């Protein structure tokens, strides 16, 4: 033990401080893991909402296409007025 203390400069006080610092780091890691899990769940929920909204948007776009009369030319097909 004295050799280890001499080689690494570890004393009982230093050992207690290291143990305390390790315990604090373990608590911080545990807290961060919880936060990461919460963020992951929020991200999953947001992606679900985005997917649902994209599906709804495609549905609305298809309905608009169906409502558009076939006999009306698109803006690209229209000839410009004579004053152009």
From Swiss-Prot:
Domain of life: Bacteria
NCBIfam families the record matches: PRK02119.1
Family: Belongs to the SlyX family.
Record's protein name: Protein SlyX homolog
Lineage, highest ranks first: Bacteria, Pseudomonadati, Pseudomonadota, Gammaproteobacteria, Pasteurellales
The encoding gene: slyX
């Amino acid at each position: 033990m004295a050799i280890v203390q001499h080689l690494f400069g570890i004393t009982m006080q230093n050992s207690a401080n290291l143990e305390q610092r390790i315990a604090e780091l373990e608590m911080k890691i545990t807290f961060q893991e919880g936060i990461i899990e919460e963020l992951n769940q929020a991200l999953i929920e947001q992606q679900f909402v985005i997917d649902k909204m994209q599906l709804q948007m495609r549905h609305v776009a298809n309905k608009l296409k169906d409502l558009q009369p076939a006999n009306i030319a698109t803006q690209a097909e229209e000839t410009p007025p004579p004053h152009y």
